Regions:
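N-terminal flanking helix/linker immediately upstream of nucleotide/cofactor-binding cores
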Residues: 281-283, 309
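Short, Lys/Arg-enriched N-terminal segment that forms or immediately precedes the first helix
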Residues: 7-20
């Protein structure tokens, strides 16, 4: 079965895992991705495709460009992969084309968290530019990219929970860190990463991860970590063997299937930076910040002593 790769770039592999790649034809491969992801197992009206992919061309030239694109794709994917309704609509037959983006979403739906986390290879159509396309196509790409990123964050977070429950604390840290890389500004993701580091006996790294998160929010959004995130750091206590007792926090509603926040920007509901003139929105007082920094330093020192011991 041909395989379409859309995460971290764009490529069509013709004969399965070991087959040759099709020559690069960006707009035509994005058209294939659109048929596979925007309307899976459904037909798309040809006039809609013309408006999305060739808005600058006249009617005759646009129809000709679509015919050539479909001819190119049929030669590589197979005529049997395409279904249609005369000259009015076209689509892909069910199961005719494997796509990495679809594989991620299907794994998430089926709660195969580790598989979904491993399958996410980067941003949807990262670095791909479709020349002379309609703004609506660019908006679809952006929405799909955000949806898949959120799916990968959820998958990595839940896979981290599974690894932690199984006692694989190293893998839990890796997966929680993967989620943190994808959503570096989300409080719930930061809490999970800090807690995973603490449970793995890396209290100093947990404190540093929190400090880096707080610095990002202050720098980029003029905001401070949520009270729950600050409370997690304050609650971290190290046992004699250096292992943190913090539990992995629950995933926020922003990462839950079916949540209206799933396709959101990935930030908690924080006030804008200019909500309080002359101050950082939601920031602590100077005394509170000094106390928090001192607490972080104490945790880091305890962790270093525990590791030496």
């Amino acid at each position: 079965m041909p395989r379409l790769f859309t995460l971290g770039g764009l490529a069509l592999r013709l004969d399965g895992a070991g087959g040759a790649h099709a020559p690069p034809q960006t707009k035509r491969l994005v058209l294939l991705a659109y048929l596979r992801l925007a309307a899976p197992d459904q037909l798309v009206r040809r006039d809609s495709l013309l408006a999305l992919f060739w808005p600058e061309l006249g009617d005759a030239a646009a129809h000709n460009a679509l015919r050539q694109a479909l001819h190119y794709l049929r030669r590589r994917v197979g005529c049997e992969a395409f279904v249609g309704q005369g000259a009015a609509a076209v689509g892909l037959a069910a199961g005719a084309l494997w796509c990495d983006a679809a594989a991620v979403e299907e794994a998430v739906i089926q709660a195969r968290w580790a598989e979904a986390a491993a399958a996410y290879g980067g941003g949807f159509l990262a670095g791909v530019h479709v020349a002379d396309a309609a703004p609506e196509l660019e908006e679809w790409v952006a929405r799909t990219r955000e949806r898949l990123r959120n799916a990968a964050v959820e998958a990595s977070s839940r896979a981290a929970d599974e690894a932690s429950a199984a006692g694989d604390l190293v893998e839990a840290v890796r997966l929680a860190g993967q989620a943190e890389q994808l959503a570096p500004d989300r409080d719930d993701v930061a809490r999970r990463f800090v807690a995973a580091l603490s449970r793995a006996g890396r209290g100093g790294d947990a404190a540093q991860a929190y400090e880096a998160f707080a610095a990002r929010l202050a720098r980029d959004y003029g905001a401070a970590p949520a009270a729950e995130t600050r409370a997690l750091l304050a609650s971290l206590r190290l046992t004699d063997d250096g292992r943190g007792a913090a539990e992995l926090p629950p995933i926020s509603a922003a990462a839950m299937p079916g949540s209206t926040a799933l396709a959101g920007p990935g930030l908690d509901d924080r006030p804008p930076a200019d909500a309080v003139p002359g101050t950082l929105a939601g920031a602590d007082s100077q005394a509170t910040r000094i106390a928090r920094i001192a607490r972080i330093a104490r945790i880091a020192r305890i962790a270093r002593i525990a590791r030496i011991a």
